[in-house]
Amino acid sequence: MIARHVPMKEAKLSSFAGLAKYITNSQEKQERVGEIRLTNFQSESLDWAVTEALHVQQRNQRAEGDKTYHLLISFAPGEKPSAEMLRDVEDRICAAIGFGEHQRVSAVHHDTDNLHIHVAIN
């Protein structure tokens, strides 16, 4: 398993809303997106969770840089952890890098040879 920060280079991904839309969009591929998870939000709706995250970002006057962090967690080809294990891995990694209590949208992707999780962290 490899976890890494993905720099927000593309303009369409440089906002929380853009990244959340990208990672949860099936792009008309039946097997692309698996479980979508919302963590530390009041809402259980993706649209409302994104709105909530954007309001939190607007209130944050201290942060000068990008307020969205894109984390990618990749597994070895052929490795297929259970949904419970994937949630646990995400929770542990986010806690380890100091984002355990932050709002996040995550999506499991099956569109490559290796299973991976994209995590948009506010």
Language-model features and meaning:
Residues 1-122:
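N-terminal nicking endonuclease/strand-transfer module with a His-rich metal-binding environment
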